């Protein structure tokens, strides 16, 4: 193993606890995998396994949408896999069981990039074997929301315990409860309505050390190092 592969493994572990549910009508008339003669090239074989031609937008097994709910958070993780070389596409949000009239922030996990998205989701082209993971978080009625991290490909159902906003005597307080291990370094990306106005003084950390704060128009990136297994980030 090299360092790059080890880092990739860290970002996909541990596996998540999942529960089965209704996924709608499924066509079972075509097998998921077929026998591919060894005489075929790798590229010919991948097209055959996907049961699709080169012009198909959604070959079998290439597009996955997982709706997640945990600790006061709701978000959708979309994974697109290069089972064959894929062109860039625009996916209507209703095809992902999301309300297209709402406002979302998209976050590309592998590129660690965020952008606003409404109506459709833009996905880039993929070479054979490549993968894109994008999180969609509804920000319509929020002034602060976690939209991604670099800890786990689920963005982030592993190190984030809960998220909430409450009204207190100090005003509105945003609270992010976290878990990890000592010396774990994580960058959390948040949508903040007026991120450019945020100062270090209004961010409070317990059990973690804040090592970097980067503010953009409506994006705040906090890089932290865990000092304890359980930690809290608060922002007034």
What are these regions (language model features)?
Residues 1-142:
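Active-site-proximal substrate-binding groove within the catalytic cores of carbohydrate-active enzymes
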Residues 61, 74-80, 88-90, 107-236:
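Non-catalytic C-terminal accessory domains or segments of carbohydrate-active enzymes
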């Amino acid at each position: 193993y090299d360092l790059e592969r080890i880092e990739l493994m860290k970002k996909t572990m541990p596996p998540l606890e999942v529960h089965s549910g209704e996924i709608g009508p499924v066509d079972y008339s075509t097998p998921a995998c077929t026998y591919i003669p060894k005489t075929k090239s790798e590229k010919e074989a991948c097209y055959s396994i996907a049961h699709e031609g080169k012009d198909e937008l959604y070959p079998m097994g290439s597009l996955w949408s997982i709706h997640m709910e945990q600790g006061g958070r709701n978000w959708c993780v979309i994974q697109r896999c290069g089972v064959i070389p894929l062109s860039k596409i625009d996916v209507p949000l209703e095809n992902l069981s999301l309300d297209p009239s709402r406002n979302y922030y998209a976050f590309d996990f592998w590129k660690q990039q965020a952008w606003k998205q409404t109506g459709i989701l833009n996905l880039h082209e993929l070479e054979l074997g490549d993968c894109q993971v994008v999180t969609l978080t509804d920000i319509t009625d929020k002034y602060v929301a976690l939209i991604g991290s670099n800890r786990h490909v689920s963005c982030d159902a592993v190190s984030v315990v809960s998220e909430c906003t409450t009204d207190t005597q100090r005003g509105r307080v945003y609270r992010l409860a976290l878990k990890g291990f000592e010396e774990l370094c994580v960058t959390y990306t948040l949508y903040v309505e007026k991120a450019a106005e945020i100062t270090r003084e209004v961010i409070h950390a317990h059990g973690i050390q804040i090592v970097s704060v980067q503010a953009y128009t409506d994006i705040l990136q906090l890089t932290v190092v865990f000092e304890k297994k359980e930690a809290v980030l608060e922002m007034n």
